Amino acid sequence: NAEYMGISNSFAKITHQTHLLPVYRFSTNVGVEEKAMGDDRLGVRYELSQKAYLKLVLHSLKHPYSEVNGIILGRTTSDPSVISIVDSVPLFHSNLALLPPLEISLLMIEEHCANVEEGLGIIGYFHANERIDDSELGMVAKNIGDHIARYFPLAPILLLDGKKLDSLKRDKSIAPVLKLYAKDAYKNWKAAGSDGGGKVVLSQPAANSILLDCMATEKWREVVDFDEHLDDITKDWSNSGLFN
């Protein structure tokens, strides 16, 4: 199958080989068409569920000296300017740019969405940089985000804001410890929100209080990502029992 040519090369890097990613059907579940979207990408409001938020941040806390990433699952709403982020999947904490594990994980996540809930799909990407003071969106994040945006044009990238996370205990903020990036009219990734445009909000105002409780109890130890699942397939990458 020409669609998968080159995928077996375990040293291929997504930073240089984004065209080798197979074509997934993300957007067929979610149902956003670019022609209906116009140039309002930076005006979209992303409502982030507590479960999705906690899994992403706890994954980064489990690997504080590594960059980590994840996939954002969600759906459109009756309001075309609002995207609901329902869940998230922790991906990797090592070799984030290797194609074969990324390919496997995306296929499994897509199948999971189809089985779990109608209308649920892969709609965005999460990234946490290695250094807490690094708030720049790197090439790997942009390229994976680009790939998802090919099939879901309103796809956001959520970047962990290490400084906000570090100060959370002191300031008790109710805002997410994340920076939102969306594509502008020229299809370049741009930080949103500073100009009153798009924003990401927590759908449950108490989410940061719950996050602080999870940090105090070291809940991050229980988070499973795809790196761990690929090493031991008995480990649940969906983390379905994490908050039971």
What are these regions (language model features)?
Residues 2, 12-18, 28:
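Ala/Thr-enriched low-complexity intrinsically disordered regions
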Residues 6, 11, 23-124, 128-244:
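N-terminal beta-strand/alpha-helix entry module and adjacent surface
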